[in-house]
Amino acid sequence: MSGPNYKADFPLLLRSPRVHYLDSAATTQRPAPVLERVMHYHTHLNGNAGRGSHELAVESALLIENTRKKTAQFINAAPTHDIVFTKSCTESLNIIAHCYALPRLRAGDEIVLAISNHHANIVPWQHVCRCTGATIQWLYPDAEGNLDIQEAQKKIRACTKIVSFSAVVNATGAVNPAQELTALAHQVGAVVVIDGAQAMVHGVPNVADLGCDFFVFSGHKMFSLFGVGVLCAPHTLLESMPPFLYGGGMVDFVTEQESVFKGAPHKYEGGSANTAAVVSLCAAIEYCESLESSAVRASVHALDAALLARLEELPFLETYHARARERLGIIAFNVKNVHSHDTAHILGEEGVMVRSGDHCSKPFMTHLSIQSCCRASFCIYNTMEDVEALTRALHAVGRIFQCS
């Protein structure tokens, strides 16, 4: 089970040897090269991008544009596609809902969503439906966690205008059949939105191969700072949509009566840019490019398999969709008859950090007939020590609650 160990690249984990961080699906830790790049920006280059002709403002703007190009190359976006920088994956999805869907959808139209979507990929569409009279159709996974393509063929039909789902399920790590769903949607002329947030650290999705119309992700789940998200879409599609935020930086000309907006992608980037976060994304991409991706994925898979084997030996524990056809580095579980927050609290006292709650996926929790669960998620810095620590801590939970 030996593989590349990148733990030495992460200062927080080095300074806190007792920490067993198994919450990377919530946010990854930041490697030293990212932190150093951000510090260099703040101490040598800090300026308000696009707000001045002096060196610092110009250099900051160049850093953003260079990161835009690097991001497009990283996800293999077609030359016809633009990269819009947002503050988060949530904002990216809201731009699509407000600027694409709201002006186009009408009563009788349908939006097809996976029940396993994050709230950020549900709530904006509910708003669109309230405003337009459109309705939502849901795709449900089978007992093992796999979306049924035959069911999707029935749900995705002539009245479908948008199909939106996660590449990797936030709560369970199950991998959705993105290419098949995209093909079904395009057969009926529907637009496809893919939330790639959970996929980015497990092998970068190839947007050109996916063929989707909109692809979104957040930087902080792939080693960058909080505060930067990405929206990738065809330039012509973005040009056909109105702006989302209005103000400085997204206009070419303003009079007392009217404004002339910049073209895409800049018309979606109103307000002062979070240049430091964008710089961190550039550094994170370069860090990801330096990794032995196949070895990293194999290592994470081995850790995941080792943990699952241990969890399945505990009679007082249940897992959710852990036997999906394909799953990437996330295991959802509960100690029977114990609230997930209580379990996570005790694990935390043992130095094991997992997420508990509904994982911003309440409809999915309802579908699973649970209120909440714990979620352990792996990344490149995890080792068998983390698996063993979680296993020991779960035995402690079992003793405390006298589980049999």
Swiss-Prot record:
Enzyme class: transferase
Alphabetized UniProt keyword annotations: Pyridoxal phosphate, Transferase
Catalytic reaction annotation: (sulfur carrier)-H + L-cysteine = (sulfur carrier)-SH + L-alanine
SUPFAM superfamilies xrefs: PLP-dependent transferases
Active site (UniProt): 360 (cysteine persulfide intermediate)
Keyword Lyase: no
InterPro entries, per the entry: Aminotrans_V_dom (IPR000192), Aminotrans_V_PyrdxlP_BS (IPR020578), Cys_dSase_SufS (IPR010970), PyrdxlP-dep_Trfase (IPR015424), PyrdxlP-dep_Trfase_major (IPR015421), PyrdxlP-dep_Trfase_small (IPR015422)
Cofactor: pyridoxal 5'-phosphate
Signal peptide limits: none
Superkingdom per UniProt: Bacteria
GO molecular function: cysteine desulfurase activity; pyridoxal phosphate binding
EC numbers on record: 2.8.1.7
Function: Catalyzes the removal of elemental sulfur and selenium atoms from L-cysteine, L-cystine, L-selenocysteine, and L-selenocystine to produce L-alanine.
NCBIfam families, per database record: sufS
Family: Belongs to the class-V pyridoxal-phosphate-dependent aminotransferase family. Csd subfamily.
UniProt protein name: Probable cysteine desulfurase
